[in-house]
Design a protein with these regions (language model features):
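Conserved class I S-adenosyl-L-methionine
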Residues: 1-40, 138-160, 194
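Class I SAM-dependent methyltransferase SAM/SAH-binding core
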Residues: 46-48, 52-99
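A conserved beta-strand element that flanks and buttresses the S-adenosyl-L-methionine
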Residues: 109
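Short catalytic micro-motifs in class I SAM-dependent methyltransferases
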Residues: 112-113
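A short glycine-rich, Lys/Arg-flanked "PGG" loop and its adjoining helix->strand segment in the class I
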Residues: 121-133
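Acceptor-substrate binding/catalytic loop of class I
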Residues: 158-174
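Core SAM-dependent methyltransferase catalytic element
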Residues: 183-185, 189-209
Length: 209
């Protein structure tokens, strides 16, 4: 599968994705509150992989500007529907990837995104370039390498082979941290926000060096 086929996958599943409940609502709320505390009213924020815009709509009211992007045009269409129902002046949705963007941002947010990119080092380097000096890079990422090996070794490859899953990387949390540091970031905090079961989704706050 290519990035174009990844986009088609998310286009096909966008309505089902939008209707699905958040598996750990309390953990999600914890991540939202932590992120709000890190952002200020003068901040220019970029969110990559925003999906149907749920997080963007929660956070955009507290910053100067908030650009929320996703590879899937159908996901962005749903996000725009939500935005029309409850407008937030600072918020703009756009179909785009990190590689297609320019400008400077004070914070880049990526939630449930980094395991889906095909070139993790390249994406991290691009995020670094998009950040202003001392800008914050805030992420929360499923680390499949720390999950049940049957998922990454059998189930996901089989689902990808028949078009039932997008591209997914199965790195460990330690490997993700190493990649973030190697891209020119200082990791300020690594936190666990889950309230159910084992947490394999580290919430990482990093600063551009």
């Amino acid at each position: 599968m290519s990035t174009a086929s990844d986009a088609r996958f998310w286009d096909r599943t966008s309505r089902k994705y939008a209707a699905a409940a958040i598996s750990d609502q309390a953990g999600y709320e914890r991540s939202l509150e932590r992120t709000r505390a890190l952002l200020g009213p003068a901040d220019r924020v970029l969110e990559l992989g925003c999906g149907t815009g749920t997080t963007a709509l929660q956070l955009a009211g507290g910053v100067q500007s908030y650009l929320a992007t996703d590879i899937s045009a159908e996901m962005i269409a749903i996000a725009e529907e939500k935005h029309a129902a409850g407008p937030v002046p600072a918020l703009v949705f756009r179909t785009a990837t990190a590689e297609a963007l320019d400008g400077q941002f004070d914070a880049v947010l990526v939630f449930n995104y980094l395991h889906l990119v095909r070139d993790l080092p390249g994406t991290l380097n691009r995020i670094h370039a998009l950040l202003a000096a001392d800008g914050l890079f805030i992420s929360k990422t499923p680390c499949l390498g720390d999950m049940n090996p049957l998922i990454r070794l059998a189930l996901l490859p089989a689902m990808r082979a028949i078009g039932k899953a997008p591209y997914v990387s199965a790195f460990r949390a330690a490997e993700l941290s190493q990649s973030i540091s190697a891209a020119g970031f200082e990791i300020l905090a690594t936190e666990s926000h889950a309230t159910k079961g084992k947490d394999a989704r580290p919430y990482i706050v990093a600063r551009k060096r």
